[in-house]
């Protein structure tokens, strides 16, 4: 599919689509001649007063195939996806861009064509396109089909490890390599691993994997979440992130926000004021510039 999509939307669906986009974290605005426009880091969805809907951006295919068509338009013209049934390990993470909460890395080992076919039938896709309410049930399905491994680094542990690695990509490479080594058969044989290329050089992850699992083939690509097994891993990572956020909220009796927006910064200031720096450090990633900005404002 090209990086744009045009269709017609019934006025009765305008509010439904807007509500779903808001739940997914899209930023909503109302440019001239539109009903509304929703934007995420990878896709924009514009609904015009005429009913025309235009989707643009590098995330267009996933957005249309896994959300817009099946859930809003109730059509399925894009779902004839060629299925890759090769046994493989998919790895993905959640939380690296969130000021509050842990870094969660998950791996899924789909060891048979039957398991992979079942993942396709479950409509697995990138977790960023799935409402949080659906994540839990999808994660349960994935665990029933495949071998899985999740590493959750709560802020206290994450901050200590980051101080050691001094680089987020190096820390990510370590968690990814640990997951792959844990799930991979030894010898790996025909099984390979696939991951998003999160560093500018493929060597960062490759070297980490080679230290632990010398014989497995590693494939790195941008937008690896388009692979169904990597997408399954992204769902498990997201599930771990959401459950960990809830655990931190319960432990410290605070409300945490996702992302790293101005609202997140304001919430951090409130936590610093009400709970103190010790608690703030236990619920956030202290290498974010937001942390020092919040501390600075607290000392004024």
Curated annotation (Swiss-Prot):
<protein>
    <recommendedName>
        <fullName>Ribonuclease HIII</fullName>
        <ecNumber>3.1.26.4</ecNumber>
    </recommendedName>
</protein>
<dbReference type="GO" id="GO:0005737">
    <property type="term" value="C:cytoplasm"/>
</dbReference>
<comment type="function">
    <text>Endonuclease that specifically degrades the RNA of RNA-DNA hybrids.</text>
</comment>
<keyword id="KW-0479">Metal-binding</keyword>
<keyword id="KW-0460">Magnesium</keyword>
<dbReference type="InterPro" id="IPR012295">
    <property type="entry name" value="TBP_dom_sf"/>
</dbReference>
<dbReference type="GO" id="GO:0006298">
    <property type="term" value="P:mismatch repair"/>
</dbReference>
<feature type="binding site">
    <location>
        <position position="196"/>
    </location>
    <ligand>
        <name>a divalent metal cation</name>
    </ligand>
</feature>
<keyword id="KW-0255">Endonuclease</keyword>
<dbReference type="InterPro" id="IPR004641">
    <property type="entry name" value="RNase_HIII"/>
</dbReference>
<dbReference type="GO" id="GO:0003723">
    <property type="term" value="F:RNA binding"/>
</dbReference>
<comment type="similarity">
    <text>Belongs to the RNase HII family. RnhC subfamily.</text>
</comment>
<dbReference type="GO" id="GO:0004523">
    <property type="term" value="F:RNA-DNA hybrid ribonuclease activity"/>
</dbReference>
<dbReference type="InterPro" id="IPR001352">
    <property type="entry name" value="RNase_HII/HIII"/>
</dbReference>
<keyword id="KW-0378">Hydrolase</keyword>
<dbReference type="InterPro" id="IPR012337">
    <property type="entry name" value="RNaseH-like_sf"/>
</dbReference>
<dbReference type="InterPro" id="IPR024568">
    <property type="entry name" value="RNase_HIII_N"/>
</dbReference>
<keyword id="KW-0963">Cytoplasm</keyword>
<dbReference type="Pfam" id="PF11858">
    <property type="entry name" value="DUF3378"/>
</dbReference>
<feature type="binding site">
    <location>
        <position position="92"/>
    </location>
    <ligand>
        <name>a divalent metal cation</name>
    </ligand>
</feature>
<dbReference type="InterPro" id="IPR024567">
    <property type="entry name" value="RNase_HII/HIII_dom"/>
</dbReference>
<feature type="binding site">
    <location>
        <position position="93"/>
    </location>
    <ligand>
        <name>a divalent metal cation</name>
    </ligand>
</feature>
<dbReference type="Pfam" id="PF01351">
    <property type="entry name" value="RNase_HII"/>
</dbReference>
<dbReference type="GO" id="GO:0032299">
    <property type="term" value="C:ribonuclease H2 complex"/>
</dbReference>
<dbReference type="GO" id="GO:0000287">
    <property type="term" value="F:magnesium ion binding"/>
</dbReference>
<feature type="domain" description="RNase H type-2">
    <location>
        <begin position="86"/>
        <end position="300"/>
    </location>
</feature>
<dbReference type="GO" id="GO:0043137">
    <property type="term" value="P:DNA replication, removal of RNA primer"/>
</dbReference>
<dbReference type="InterPro" id="IPR036397">
    <property type="entry name" value="RNaseH_sf"/>
</dbReference>
<keyword id="KW-0540">Nuclease</keyword>
């Amino acid at each position: 599919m090209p990086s744009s999509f045009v269709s017609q939307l019934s006025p009765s669906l305008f509010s439904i689509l807007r509500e779903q986009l808001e739940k997914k974290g899209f930023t909503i605005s109302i440019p001239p001649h539109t009903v509304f426009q929703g934007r995420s880091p990878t896709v924009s969805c514009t609904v015009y007063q005429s009913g025309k809907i235009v989707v643009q951006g590098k995330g267009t295919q996933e957005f249309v195939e896994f959300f817009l068509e099946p859930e809003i338009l109730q059509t399925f013209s894009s779902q004839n996806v060629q299925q890759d049934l090769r046994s493989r390990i998919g790895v993905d993470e959640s939380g690296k861009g969130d000021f509050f909460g842990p870094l969660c890395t998950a791996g899924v080992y789909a060891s048979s064509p039957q398991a992979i076919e079942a993942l396709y039938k479950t409509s697995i896709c990138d977790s960023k396109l799935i409402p949080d309410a659906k994540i839990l049930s999808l994660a349960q399905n994935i665990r029933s089909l495949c071998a899985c491994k999740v590493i959750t680094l709560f802020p206290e542990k994450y901050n200590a490890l980051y101080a050691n690695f001094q680089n987020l990509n190096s820390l990510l490479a370590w968690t990814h390599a640990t997951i792959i080594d844990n799930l991979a058969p030894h010898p790996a044989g025909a099984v390979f691993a696939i991951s998003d290329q999160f560093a500018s050089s493929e060597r960062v992850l490759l070297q980490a994997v080679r230290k632990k699992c010398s014989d497995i083939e590693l494939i790195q690509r941008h937008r690896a979440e388009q692979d169904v097994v990597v997408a399954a891993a992204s769902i498990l990572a997201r599930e771990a992130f959401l459950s960990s956020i809830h655990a931190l909220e319960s432990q410290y009796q605070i409300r945490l926000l996702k992302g790293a927006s101005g609202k997140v910064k304001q919430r951090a200031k409130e936590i610093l004021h009400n709970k103190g720096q010790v608690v703030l450090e236990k619920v956030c990633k202290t290498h974010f510039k937001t942390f020092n900005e919040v501390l600075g404002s607290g000392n004024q």
